[in-house]
Amino acid sequence: MPNSNGPLSNSGGKLQNDPRDRGTSPPQRAIADYDDGESVHLTLDPSVQDGRFHPRFSGLTGTVVGTQGDAFKVEVNDGGMDKTLIVGAAHLRTQRQEE
């Protein structure tokens, strides 16, 4: 039986930028501020290593429940179980609210 090649072996597509997005990401993303109770989307920014979450949670939507240092605590539901992730602002996007 072959080796697994590590815990991030099947996450290559999630950890690569599209050709148009390569290089330094916009600084506005890294300093964005989110309020408690705000809904946010989890999207990995491969250009920023700090504050990254495990790729298994990529694409989920969660709720900001607080801060820890410069990062945000985001609560997500993973298969019926609530989990709290510590995520940097560069990896979060605000969910658009319908008006």
From Swiss-Prot:
InterPro entries: Ribosomal_eL21, Ribosomal_eL21_arc, Ribosomal_eL21_CS, Ribosomal_eL21_sf, Translation_prot_SH3-like_sf. The keyword Repeat does not apply. GO terms for cellular component: ribonucleoprotein complex; ribosome. Keywords: Ribonucleoprotein, Ribosomal protein. One of its GO terms (molecular function) is structural constituent of ribosome. Residues 1-38 are annotated as: Disordered. The keyword Cell inner membrane does not apply. One of its GO terms (biological process) is translation. Residues 1-14 have a biased composition (Polar residues). PROSITE patterns: RIBOSOMAL_L21E (PS01171). Belongs to the eukaryotic ribosomal protein eL21 family. HAMAP family: Ribosomal_eL21. This is Large ribosomal subunit protein eL21. It comes from Halobacterium salinarum (strain ATCC 700922 / JCM 11081 / NRC-1). The lineage of its organism: Archaea, Methanobacteriati, Methanobacteriota, Stenosarchaea group, Halobacteria. The gene is rpl21e.
